[in-house]
Amino acid sequence: MLKKIKTLMLISGIADVLQMMPLFLALFSPEIKTFFMEDGIQGSSQNPMAVEVFNIFFLVFAFLGLAFIVATFVARTFENLEVLQKSSLLLAIYHLAWALPDFINITMGKPHAPLLIMLLSLIPVVSLFYAWKNGEL
């Protein structure tokens, strides 16, 4: 059974990279950015103010995503079981806060991330909470 905290954090970090990939790609690909903009609000890619807002949105969320990834991989370097467990708890709480809005929106029939991304966002939440409660060195 998977109980090694560092392995669970590695799985979480890989899931983070996979779920953030479309966001990172949107920063460098005008086609992907336009797709996301039009998927969210039709006609927004034609409005210069909306484009600016989306550019800021993509940049802020890309940095947040990068922070999640870096924090997860840095936490893997800790050697103390208690520190690893507390780090897992803190990371799990942040990941839950990141994932929860999409799940609330889907239950309310509002726009949300694609289901694959939503499922990927659950992997870190579950693995990090599990590491906090049951993890071993």
Task: Give the residues covered by each predicted segment.
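Membrane-interfacial loop-to-transmembrane alpha-helix junctions, especially the N-terminal start
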Residues: 5-9, 82-91
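Short juxtamembrane and helix-loop transition motifs at transmembrane-helix boundaries
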Residues: 45-55, 75-86
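Membrane-helix boundary connector in multi-pass membrane proteins
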Residues: 97-117, 132-137
